[in-house]
């Protein structure tokens, strides 16, 4: 019994501990818990928020705990009494990175304050400043030390000392293990830097027993270390060699931390100290692991519509259901906890459906029979482990073959033909333990013969256990060595048909996609990747023919051709192609681009088949379109392909060039597709960013009449029924079935009630499945086939036991981050799933006013309304244009008085994005009545704060350089970064020198475009009378260029810094960059809703090799703005950059236009005399 009790102590995932006296506080199951340190005993819940919680910290007197909670959508500081009772929310900052760090020591009068860091009021989320927040709930006082990620304070030798941690990465150390880039962290004690050459992560700094303690992985694994206050005497106090020590905290003499789901304590920092594990057991039912129902409409993962459009197979959170469209019940097809079903595909009119399952740990195809009134049939499982990661699954019209696109570039044909029906039915009956239908004498005889066979195999208990939850009867393990299916109860015995896998073709440049069969099932077409991973070509393959398989190139690979489909009469092949080259002039820089490059194209498969868009010597029929054929082939007829001249028969549809996707053939010889509006990358094209005009339109094209019509004005996606007569449309979580060739009305539109699907989630089983699937995704997509020497299976085995402790989506995400952290590679991210439980109250965003307010004698004054930028719609203060001036006093919000201590922020809780009324009294010394204004508070102030931040730094550069240096800041390498770069480029390059600031650059993919602009050279000038000369090339730097980078310059920011140095554009000033250049492509949603990214694309440079990853790019000149520089208002980094630029100007003067002194003489020369 004692052993059983001991094991019970480690069934929970314990995190984020702190201690005070004999009490221990920690986070588990998304709540705070308290436990006694004296010995084993049950912990008790302190909060019941059931939502993500941050690190808790006891107050110095041990009576309260400050912690970070996500109860209000974003993290805010909360305070809860240790003895129980309601907690209080202390901050209403609305930032994304708020975190409690600790408490300040008591002042002589006994008062103390919470120490927290937050990006509130900053332009970037990584710029977290330290704040002191008093327990009475004032908005907090910003401390002057600049951006910090942790702060501790203590009274040492009669003096208040501050310990700061700066320059850390955006990830926790365990999420990128053995990170050695430029953002490993800098430790400061009272302005002096400690341990500058440690060479590993620094985190969790603490004052402990007269020493400085911290966590570091500079020796390969995260452990607890300490040093003297001058940085000498480094000691290691723990010896974890497999799992990282994480999230350490101290009461000043002892240290507690988490490791592998357990809590550990180090009683002192003596040289021989050793950690001990704390025996902590939780009380309660572990509610986060209990089964619960989820709304199907929020978890639709795929749909396949039946032949006539009367019902669909619907994937809901990894399970498959059969749902009639109008009335009728929902029926389970496949629903096994811990098994994920994907990519359902109807097998023609055979009454069967195929889908991908991972029931055996690898992708396999399972074939189930659709529900019938006579009862179910056993499912068959095929090709387990031989398909790779299945990306697409398409059936031929007869339902005998599946085309499979695998992650590794293989295009496979899987035989799913029906085995001998009588034998299969009989064996199913015997295996199920009941006799076959007595009315079927042939079946009964077959069953008797099978049952009496001398070598009949024994019952397969394992297979029966696997099938227990499917709702469709037993599943036969069909992954036999012979490649075929096996009958139930007969493991390893091939069935009469099915299961053979044939590789049709293999791409060497990424996966094939967009598979489609011809109406007769003889031909298969797809989009094949080409040069540079952007070009694609259309290919076709004749699968059945007297000469075997024949692969044909329909297009030549010069363009991006995708989404090929056969028309339902088999006469044409249609596809989408990005081959339009009608350039559009850029209104700002004069560049040209091709935003209207896509159209649908049509290929007559025979030269004898007329193009519906071609001219006819006899003219067109009165109704337009084509003349009816005397021998109309109809749908599903034999497809005749004349290979010669296919490429020359490619013809564009007579529709406007735009952005198209999801091309599909429908009944009546028509086609449908989605047409997307041309909009900007930042969503500012439309007056209202939430306008549905940003969503696609579903259009139908009638080939016979060469006419286009609109079916649905906006939607998310759609699926086509087997006969092409109906479409199932998903629109903002609602499903409806509509006609495929005309606009639906009240009678022809069927709204599909997803509430009939009652899906129950087993969180523990989902997490086990999601964990294994994440492991397979990493194995399949990680950039190095050899996993950079990592034994990935061993890593998965090491962390797998911790799954049984997890009890919330956030805990599962935390565990998964530890696992992916073992890759030691950038861009391995995990986003937690949204839980379906949490606080019962209504959640909305904090409202922000885009202004700096200050409290003076209990009155809240508008100190400064941020000016913003009229070229950025998101960078506008709600108070701009209201007539409110600096100095006005905010007295009421929606008629409620502003508290003199708390300020207006609590009254703006939940007001983000909605209209509120603000009442202002005149500024001090001004007369007049109060004013009421209506404004819409912001949800996110960062764009507004960012423009103000850039303007201030430009002013600094102007002042330091005497106006000779231009200044550009690039916040990222995406749409917003490109916009910001070009917003000020023309003005700033006109100055003699240029400072290009990429500090804090969040990365992206456009560094090449920025480099192209910066490498322009002035070769000459264009002079116009009464106007200033213009350089050729235009918008080129006139003189020296200096780059500024820091440890937050990341990803594509690393790339542009490397390119800047390799191209010798100019010196780089600052700090070594982040060091993360193994990029990701897309995001993978797991079965539980978690999202992971896989490092897929590794950057290599001639000069640096692979070394930029996990190291970064070192500057030419190091410069650092220390906490004291921030406190005293100095700009040493910009100062150094400007100094270098001015020095370079002395030796490399800027390009200047010529004057009119040496213009050519074009006057008429005198006529020379005759000779």
UniProtKB/Swiss-Prot annotation:
Active site: 827, 1051, 1109
Keywords, sorted A to Z: Cytoplasm, Hydrolase, Protease, Serine protease
Cellular localisation: Cytoplasm
A GO MF term: serine-type peptidase activity
Residues engaged in binding substrate: 1002-1004, 1079-1081
InterPro entries with a match to the protein in the record: ClpP/crotonase-like_dom_sf (IPR029045), PD40 (IPR011659), PDZ_sf (IPR036034), Tail-specific_protease (IPR005151), Tricorn_C1 (IPR028204), Tricorn_PDZ (IPR029414), Tricorn_protease (IPR012393), WD40/YVTN_repeat-like_dom_sf (IPR015943)
Site (Transition state stabilizer): 1052
Region (Disordered): 432-498, 1149-1171
Entry-linked Pfam families: PD40, PDZ_Tricorn, Peptidase_S41, Tricorn_C1
Family: Belongs to the peptidase S41B family.
Protein name according to UniProt: Putative tricorn protease homolog 2
Organism, scientific name: Streptomyces coelicolor (strain ATCC BAA-471 / A3(2) / M145)
